[in-house]
């Protein structure tokens, strides 16, 4: 059963580098609690509480290992583990985009996290924007994604966006 808190911590804390991709529908963030030496158990719990209290219906983790997935369950948040695979990128992207599209079409508010909010996760989200037809032009999709990220994308991220339409 989900733990319910009272008082000033009842709403949790916003996950680090939380960024809306599609306002009130799809967001990205750093792994709740941080990663590596910066990982903190209490911070993880507070960030998962924030995700729950802000109505996210599903967390999708793209990190390689299934770390902390049980914490979502303990706090009453649905989670899916979809480890990013660069080895067969097109197959992974096609499957990921279809699943994400179905979640969003069903009205589920989704947050996707990697270890950090870097070009990998930003490129994957920019690719989704293009794949879903939310932006009609490759160059425009790159520009929109760079605005969301607040910086220029690396070649990997740009390539994901450029190849997204052929994955439909």
Outline where the language-model segments fall.
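Short glycine/threonine-rich catalytic loop with a Thr-x-Gly-x-Asp
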Residues: 115-122
